[in-house]
A protein has these predicted regions:
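Short secondary-structure boundary segments
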Residues: 11, 35-36, 89
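Helix N-cap/beta->alpha junction signal
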Residues: 66, 88-89
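Metal-dependent phosphodiesterase/nuclease catalytic metal-binding core
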Residues: 1-11, 17-21
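Short phosphate-engaging motifs
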Residues: 16, 91
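Residue-level signal for inorganic ion chemistry
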Residues: 7, 31, 85-88
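C-terminal helical cap/extension that packs against the catalytic core
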Residues: 18-82
Length: 91
């Protein structure tokens, strides 16, 4: 078991973004949106955060790349928390 679930999420812009974000709204305590560096198809983190807010009413954090997102996730968790990195496997 764990205390808190932080999700680091990135996805290609041509995927079913709303369908992918709905489960996050139910399961995650914190969400950090990011994108794969050098992938032209990657959805922009700010757009993902806006769509997530429209779907869930919840706010999320954004980072320009995976390294920054992971640093933010690690800083915001403790030993009883879980970090899940998911989305398109370009990350």
């Amino acid at each position: 078991s764990y205390d808190s679930l932080t999700v680091v999420f990135g996805i290609a812009s041509d995927k079913d973004i709303p369908g992918s974000l709905r489960p996050l709204a139910q399961a995650a305590d914190k969400v950090i949106f990011t994108r794969a560096t050098g992938n032209a198809r990657a959805a922009r983190p700010g757009e993902l955060a806006r769509t997530f807010h429209e779907i869930s009413g919840k706010h999320a954090m954004t980072c320009p790349d995976l390294a920054d997102a992971m640093e933010l996730a690690v800083r915001g968790t403790n030993r009883e928390d879980v970090i899940c990195v998911t989305g398109s496997f370009y990350l």
